[in-house]
A protein has these predicted regions:
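Enzymes that bind and transform nitrogen-containing heteroaromatic metabolites
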Residues: 1-242
């Protein structure tokens, strides 16, 4: 257990991206004491406090890309930028990672008013998709976006290799539940960083968990006086990508 004098920046150092010869994968999310990430599917639920939210933005500043599933995009309309260190609502750090959407059938309507497109400094998301809709793909590329077509959107080795081929050496996987479950189950994650809020969401809550048991190495816990949340950070042994 860390002392209050130790910052989360120091605590997280061993779990940050540490390789450039492949795409380093970090899975990070906030959950309740009963391992729920939301009160119900599709319902946005605030779990992180101000301090651990700032920690999330610190992590974003350390990654090339930030990845979420299309259901999370539609439900939450996130900005997916980095506001560290100021945390000002109108601040968009030059360290903001590249947004990446997992969108099997390319459902995202980029012509609508999305939060992450409102700033002139915002980065248009990279769409990872199985879709062969050449018209929509061409329109999005003309719009200024980028598309990575994959054979199987559940194949995280293919996703990581694709990201690396585009120059991304690290990706932060933030959600939602299906994406977290799939990524953890694949065994490709290098680090897992979980914020645990002091609340139960109940059996109707949306859980995030892999489909089988996973043992992590070097687990560490961080707490600080006056901060209600706890952070658990762990290392994984990623599958071979060679």
């Amino acid at each position: 257990m860390n002392t209050p004098e130790n910052s989360y920046e120091q605590f997280l150092e061993p779990y940050l991206p540490s390789t450039t010869d492949r795409c380093f994968v970090t899975v990070t999310y906030a959950q309740s004491l009963d391992a729920r990430i939301a009160c119900a599917p599709g319902e946005r639920t605030k779990l992180s406090g101000a301090d651990t939210k700032r920690m999330t933005h610190f992590l974003r500043s350390k990654h090339d890309a930030i990845l979420v599933g299309i259901d999370t995009v539609i439900a939450d309309n996130p900005r997916l930028n980095c506001r560290y260190p100021t945390m000002a609502e109108d601040y968009n750090s030059p360290l903001s990672p590249q947004p990446v959407f997992l969108d099997t059938h390319f459902r995202w309507d980029f012509t609508k008013d999305w939060a992450l497109l409102r700033s002139s400094t915002s980065k248009k998301p990279l769409i990872i998709t199985e879709s062969k809709n050449s018209g929509k793909i061409a329109s999005y590329i003309e719009f200024g976006g980028e598309v990575l077509q994959v054979q199987d959107i559940r194949n995280w080795t293919e996703i990581a290799r694709g990201l690396y081929s585009l120059g991304y050496t690290s990706v932060m996987v933030e959600g939602g539940a299906k994406v977290i479950d799939s990524c953890l189950t694949s065994g490709i994650a290098d680090s897992v960083i979980i914020t645990i809020a002091p609340v139960f969401l109940g059996t109707n809550g949306l859980a995030a968990a892999p489909s089988h048991a996973i043992t992590f190495s070097e687990p560490r816990w961080w707490r600080s006086e006056g901060v209600p949340d706890t952070i658990c950070a762990m290392k994984c042994d990623p599958i071979s990508m060679k």
